[in-house]
């Protein structure tokens, strides 16, 4: 969704800055060349985004309106049916050629939603035992804002954050990731941190509330990873925002070298990038890649 907004050349997105932090060359390639056609992994990832965002939305509305958590299976079944109907309709329109793939993933996704529901119910029970009111417990475990759009003229940034939570200590920003490889997620950790820190900066500007924490929801195994966001991290991203724009004026950055060359093996633009390289791989990079194969 951020890709469309980034077509305005003066605006960048949190995803673009995340690319820059991972590899300036990746950032440059994504700005200068098309992203290409959709792949099975991106389609499934987008579908899961839609599903879990709607789970947040429908679940909060239902539980809040009833003032309690329904304990019947029919309640969850009805909600999941509406969630799938919504997400399938969007995917059928966006990616008709991948519809069979999406259908095959519905059963395991339904199972994960059922486990996620149990997790959320336990979260509410635990908070209630700590003295939280039902309303406060719901607001703690389910987002205040979903798919919130940002547009900052101050920083020339635009984008959407998957979820924002409202807490007594300020806001918490969340991104949904569908990585099915924990090593891949680890290698891209710097990207994730930069992306969420950018969301934090934009949320603070828009809502005039502090953002000291961010979290990633990994939908493949329904677990959360959270981390603190310091002023130092925010200042670093603000500087990267300026540095990234300089690169667009200077031209293609050099390839990664040394230990950083390991990142190339985990980059989705690997083939495109290497086709643009005129020089042979240096010995250190070859050794680094050989160790991963």
Question: Which role does the model predict for each range below?
Answer:
Residues 23, 48-49, 163, 199, ...:
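A residue-level signal for conserved active-site and pocket-lining positions in enzyme catalytic cores
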Residues 2, 53, 57, 151, ...:
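Accessory terminal regions of nucleic-acid processing enzymes
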Residues 1-90:
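Charged, glycine-rich intrinsically disordered N-terminal tails and low-complexity linkers that flank
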Residues 138-243:
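Mg2+/Mn2+-dependent nuclease catalytic core
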Residues 33, 56, 60, 178-181, ...:
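Hydrophobic/aromatic-lined pockets within catalytic cores
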Residues 51-144:
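A non-catalytic, helix-rich entry segment at domain boundaries
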Residues 35-39, 184, 255:
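Short, polar/flexible loop-turn hinges at active-site or ligand-entry regions and domain interfaces
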Residues 10, 189-192, 196, 260, ...:
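Active-site-proximal structural scaffolding
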């Amino acid at each position: 969704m951020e890709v469309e907004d980034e077509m305005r050349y003066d605006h960048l997105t949190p995803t673009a800055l995340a690319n820059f932090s991972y590899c300036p060359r990746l950032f440059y390639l994504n700005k200068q060349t098309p992203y290409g056609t959709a792949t099975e992994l991106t389609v499934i990832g987008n579908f899961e985004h839609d599903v879990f965002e709607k789970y947040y939305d429908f679940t909060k509305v239902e539980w809040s309106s009833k003032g309690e958590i329904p304990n019947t299976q029919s309640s969850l079944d009805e909600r999941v049916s509406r969630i799938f109907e919504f997400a399938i309709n969007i995917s059928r329109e966006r990616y008709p050629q991948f519809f069979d793939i999406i259908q095959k993933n519905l059963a395991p996704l339904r199972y994960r939603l059922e486990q996620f529901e149990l997790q959320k119910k336990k979260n509410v029970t635990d908070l209630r035992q700590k003295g939280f009111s039902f309303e406060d417990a719901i607001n703690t475990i389910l987002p205040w804002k979903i798919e919130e759009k940002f547009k900052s003229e101050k920083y020339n940034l635009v984008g959407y954050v998957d979820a924002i939570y409202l807490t007594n200590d300020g806001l918490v920003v969340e991104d949904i990731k569908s990585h099915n490889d924990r090593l891949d997620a680890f290698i891209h950790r710097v990207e994730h941190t930069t992306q969420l820190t950018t969301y934090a900066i934009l949320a603070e500007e828009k809502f005039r509330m502090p953002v000291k924490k961010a979290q990633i929801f990994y939908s493949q195994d329904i677990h959360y990873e959270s981390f603190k966001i310091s002023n130092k991290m925010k200042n670093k991203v603000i500087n990267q925002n300026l540095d990234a724009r300089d690169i667009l004026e200077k031209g293609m950055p050099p390839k990664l070298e040394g230990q950083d060359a390991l990142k190339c093996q985990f980059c989705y633009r690997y083939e495109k990038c290497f086709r643009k390289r005129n020089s042979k791989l240096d010995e250190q990079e070859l050794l680094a890649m050989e160790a991963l194969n």
